[in-house]
């Protein structure tokens, strides 16, 4: 089995990997995202995912696969990362309700053994419910939206406020499992190569 490192502290990403039999080594990158400037949201998540994976890869010398990810929600051309405050989360939800947005997740997979990197971006459309101000206030008070790109967690309380997903649901949670499989294949691996054997 090839060691698989997740360059993220995200519990949701870790759970997604565990669902498909991968128990990753968790090593958050602590990369300063503010240093990255990009012309488009797609370029931004691509660069951030790569920088996170490369930062963690520097601390490994043995063969391993390093996965870095970054997600943003795009609504009306505006990028919604994690909100800086409850007030910002409320304002964003007031803009998001009843709207359709795109959730973009950049994925960078580094194979240290081959010295190769694959970087791809997955986009999933999210249709939000027409939620009331009271529902928004209660949801933000739960604290959940403050830890999530786009101010919601599909796999948490926020799932009740999503009417429809067009695309890959796991991408909205933070990691496209079908895309991860394709990235592994492009580097010459299968899921079985990184799954923990019982």
UniProtKB/Swiss-Prot annotation:
Its main location: cytoplasm. The keyword Zinc-finger does not apply. The active site is at residue 70. It comes from the Bacteria. It is an enzyme of class 3 (hydrolase). One of its GO terms (molecular function) is nucleoside triphosphate diphosphatase activity. GO terms for biological process: nucleotide metabolic process. PANTHER family: BIFUNCTIONAL DTTP/UTP PYROPHOSPHATASE/METHYLTRANSFERASE PROTEIN-RELATED, BIFUNCTIONAL DTTP_UTP PYROPHOSPHATASE_METHYLTRANSFERASE PROTEIN-RELATED. This is Nucleoside triphosphate pyrophosphatase.
């Amino acid at each position: 089995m090839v060691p698989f490192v997740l360059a993220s502290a995200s519990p949701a990403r870790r759970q997604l990997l565990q669902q498909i039999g991968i128990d990753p080594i968790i090593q958050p990158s602590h990369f300063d995202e503010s240093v990255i400037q990009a012309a488009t949201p797609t370029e931004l998540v691509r660069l951030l995912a790569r920088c996170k994976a490369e930062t963690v890869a520097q601390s490994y010398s043995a063969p391993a696969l390093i996965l870095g990810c970054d997600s943003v929600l795009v609504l009306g051309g505006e990028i919604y990362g994690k909100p800086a405050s409850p007030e910002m989360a409320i304002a964003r939800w007031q803009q998001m309700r009843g709207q359709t947005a795109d959730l973009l997740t950049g994925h960078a997979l580094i194979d240290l053994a081959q010295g190769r990197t694959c970087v791809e971006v997955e986009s999933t459309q999210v249709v939000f419910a027409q939620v009331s101000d009271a529902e928004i206030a209660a949801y933000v008070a739960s604290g959940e939206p403050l830890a999530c790109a786009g101010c919601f967690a599909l796999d948490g309380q926020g799932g009740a406020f999503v009417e429809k997903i067009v695309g890959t649901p796991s991408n909205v949670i933070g990691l496209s499992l079908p895309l991860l499989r394709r990235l592994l294949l492009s580097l010459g691996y299968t899921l079985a190569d990184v799954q923990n054997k019982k």
